[in-house]
Amino acid sequence: MKLRALDISEANSYIKRILINDPILSNLKVKGEISNFKVHSSGNVYLSLKDETSKLNCVIFKSNFNRNLKLDNGVKIIANGYISVYERDGAYQLYINEIEIEGIGNLHIEFNRLKEKLNKEGLFDPKYKIPIPKMPNSIGVITSPTGAVIRDIINVIKRRYPKVNIKLYPVTVQGDKSAEEICEAIRFFNHMKNVDTLIVGRGGGSIEELWSFNDEMVAREVFNSQIPIISAVGHETDFTICDFVSDMRAPTPSAAAEIATPSLDDINYKLGNIKSRMSKSLTNQIELDQYRLETVFNKINNYLDSYTIKDKVIQLDKIYDKIIFGIENNLKLEDEKLVKIGALLHNLSPLATMDRGYSITQKNGKVINSIKGLKIKDSIDIVLKDGNLECMIDKIENKEG
């Protein structure tokens, strides 16, 4: 008998009917440790149950979910339900109807033990946190070289702050060698000192997949780093030891890129605000100085207009008038004295004597005031007020004899 080819939906539907009708799979009870626990916004719960070698995807519908149960990653449970196929994806999963809590898984016990130990040593103390540089020149990224994480980090950084230099140190982010590679990367950047900030991260996953970032060796290397480290491991609900010892925890790798870089738009906005404040401050200072100058000028003018100044000016005017009057009076008195002296000198002048009819007799340019030395026929000059006479002596009389 030749069978026709089935559509994928037909094949998945057929498998689903087989699983539902199986007496064991239709009422299956399993035990395991919860991993990838997530409560959807619809109210449905999605998780995986795992043991040392395998895992089984599970669903708890909202109507069957008991919120009083403290379910979380690492909790061991006994689950009862049925196996069916999610036809769209062709994936079989356990649809849980009942849950019984059995205990806590070994990895979560180890996680809590290490967390408590490092906390007591002070590795989580905020005083050891190094501030993240606000405007880095270079950022180191420690993650897988492939996948969405590194692409998201690069895209966010280049969009926000394109001038920054990105240095990738590729590592495996899960597996036996992962922890040692992460430690080597941190030591490398601290030795080179060529970056301002480090981002250590990976995408989401189960506690097993994230376990490298819960490794004590990685935790101590992160704590000892002289370069500030942003931890960006998993999704927002995932927490690792690396998150607690790092200088800053980011909920996602993209958020880490935003924390590590300023936004050019924010920088331009802040610069605009600074410019505006400086301009306003300068304008206010100029206006204040102008007001102060006007106040000083007004005070000076008011002082000059005061009665005290006016009185002093009047007093100075009076003193000036007195000085001028004294000078003029003294000049007048001195002028009168000069007139009198001039008159006296005029009266004593030979010219004044001539005005009264007197003359001056000279011989050879010398004044003659006696007949002694004169002889008949001597030539003499007689000076009058308006001219000279040349005479010859023809007679000499002596009054004494």
Swiss-Prot record:
The compartments listed are: Cytoplasm
Using the UniProt record, name the top-level EC class of this enzyme in a single word: hydrolase
- Its EC number is 3.1.11.6
Q: Which GO terms describe its cellular component?
A: cytoplasm; exodeoxyribonuclease VII complex
- Nuclease as a keyword? yes
- InterPro entries noted in UniProt: Exonuc_VII_L, Exonuc_VII_lsu_C, OB-fold_nuc-bd_dom
CDD domains per record: ExoVII_LU_OBF
Report TM segments: none
Q: Name one GO biological process term.
A: DNA catabolic process
A molecular function (GO) held by this record is: nucleic acid binding
Q: Does the keyword Hydrolase apply?
A: yes
Where it mainly occurs, coarsely classed, is cytoplasm
Whom does it interact with, and what assembly results? Answer: Heterooligomer composed of large and small subunits.
Q: Which family does it belong to?
A: Belongs to the XseA family.
Q: What is this protein called?
A: Exodeoxyribonuclease 7 large subunit
The gene name on file is: xseA
